[in-house]
Amino acid sequence: MNHELTNIPSIRHNHPTFWRDLANGTYLKLAPRIAVHRDHYHGLSLSSQLRLRAIAAARSAYTAVLISKSAARVHGLWVLDSTEEKVEMALPHNSLPNKHRRHPERVYRKTKLPDPLLVHGARTVSPARAVIDIARFHGFREGLVAADSALLTGITKKKLRQEFARMGRIRNSAVVREVIHHSCATSPSPYASFARALLIQADFPWPMFYEVIYTALPGITAELCINKTYIIDIAEPDDKHTAGSSSTAIGPATTIEPPGEVTATTIPTKPRDQVDHSRDKRLRDAGFTVIRISPHQLVQHPERFISEVIATISARQNAVRAQRSRL
């Protein structure tokens, strides 16, 4: 990681190209003392850019420590990407920097810090502490995403609870406890974790049971299943043919489509479309209901996802009641 960043104070004043490149934008100044080559930076994914910015900010600071989402990124934990995300830092001694020293792309939080770790030259809190910070600063949904990924790396719920206990009395402690309680070590993706968080928070009129990595049929595994009946399919970001669309298949012949949306089965057939169609048909024939949503739609319109789940379950129950009444 360190070779990607240039420590500006280490460059001699008579360097033949660096200072000119820094002035003309060939090198980007990510932090007061850290620069990165423009082509390298723009070639990274948003997630990698945010991680690099966090490391640059910490390496450019004298005492500040990365916390919350920024710490999670440095440790490789799941964090949902946002172009509006700022680097999150804290100062020792539970203090805040003077206003004239604050950077517009950073957020300083007043919090007690443990002894920091050093990762890629950046001072940061531990992965367990990062999870707790995300839960208390950003809420249950993003906290559960981070907690699930922490458990995947081998951090236990016991370790999370111990770290939480060491912090003493803090705000939003109830949210932290809920995140730890509901976290699991088998979530297949941050989007599956986010969807599960939405389902946990939703006020459903029926009992709801969730299973992660559910084997619905031989050779067909779902990221998330509700009540052993409703399969939640979350298209990955590179599945362009389903991005921005959602469909809910009810029974062998009926498809419920949200207004204005295009379902995967109406798009011109591609090899992946054929696989999805065959998979959905097998699931429907076996009595499952498939709810498909893109990651973008899930994160940008969470209330729509919950509304679709409620509408889907209601429609299925109404169809079953109508069928029974005809018998």
Which ranges hold each PLM region?
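Short gly/ser-rich loop at a beta-strand->alpha-helix junction or flexible surface loop bordering the NTP-binding
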Residues: 1-172, 208, 314, 318-327
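Surface segments flanking catalytic/ligand-binding clefts of nucleic-acid enzymes
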Residues: 6-13, 151-327
